[in-house]
Amino acid sequence: MDIAWIEWINVLFRFTHVLAAIMWIGNSLLFTWMELNLVVPRTDDAKGQPRDPDLMGTLDMLHGGGVFHLEKRVMHAHAIPERLHWFKWQSYTTWITGLVLLGALFWSNGTTLLDATRTALSPATAVLCSLAGLLGGWLVYDGIWRSPLGRKPILAATASLLALFTAAHFYGQIFNGRALFLQIGAMMGTFMSANVFVHIMGNQHKFMRSLRQGRPYDSRYGKAAKSRSLHNHYMTFPVLFLMLSAHFPRLYAADWNVPILAIVVIALMAIKHLMNSRYHFKYWLWWIFGTVAVSAHLIGILLHLPPPAALAQGAMPPDPAVLSGKTLFQTQACATCHMQGSSQIGPSLYGIYGTTQELADGSRALVDDAYIKTSLLDPASQVVKGFAPAMPSFAGKLDDGQVADLIAYIRSLTPQIPRAQAAP
């Protein structure tokens, strides 16, 4: 696909994706908040009148200089409102635009998914693995909650998370960090949208069809829809984080990115639960602070651990210069554009040292220490052909020692290149 079309698709569909997601997640948060704050009517009202048996709860909300008085009621066939609002297209639009973005940015060029330092999979196989995760992940998740295990929410939720993190471990062996986080986010987003289509809308259609056929109110359909709606509610925070994960290269480019992903997902679900508990749990806010502190501490430990392979093999600690350069590579957001595999933003630095690159002005340059240093301090003069001149200059931002450390790290990404090729 022509790069210009990909960029236009990126702009249009990314904005639509974000806009629809805001509307969808906003609905999820609001409806659950209203459910939690409904005031269940007493046996008799203040005037001594018997309680309305069809009234499930009331809620008064102050906004815009007035009060919204909300009632949740049992609906009967003779009292179906003429104008009834359904909430589904926010979900469908989010999922469809997300799928288009995955196709344009990752599936159209499967190498953007892969970590070439870990796998020799073909781009086509990588795309198939990604697609299989969306469909297979939904089938596993839905199967868990349809099974007898689904009647035990804590066990079913644990099984669902274990299945999700198993998938993350698998993709962590073949995908680069950015693609890994977005893949798991896309899988969770698929669970949510499929919940809307299959269970929430499906049961609501059954409910309305039953009423229009004159049958009495049946609470089973509403309970089934509400259960999956609550699933979606708890997935909102993790999906938002993973949706924005391209902005967190320090995390997705880490050696221990799969455990970091797991900690983030669990912590954000726990925080959502604590927020829901605020009306009956006195210390909910302190527990949120504690969850954030513990999660940040665990992630901090993982960020400073040697790579898993080094720990498993008992390897010697890495060169301090390489380790410092790697930290700079992550904290300076280099990994955002120069990730493993190929990128549409900047060239991958994995295996680039010692190669000859064609520049935008038609000249050719050997990628050695001198080239990397010039690229860092004066990137406009070293733009590789096919990429936009978007790299910022680090002149005045990095001292000579930091530049040397970054060069050492980039050199280490091509270990087969002899040290003698380094510029003096």
Annotate each language-model stretch with its function:
Residues 321-324, 368, 372, 402-406:
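Stable alpha-helical elements in mature extracytoplasmic
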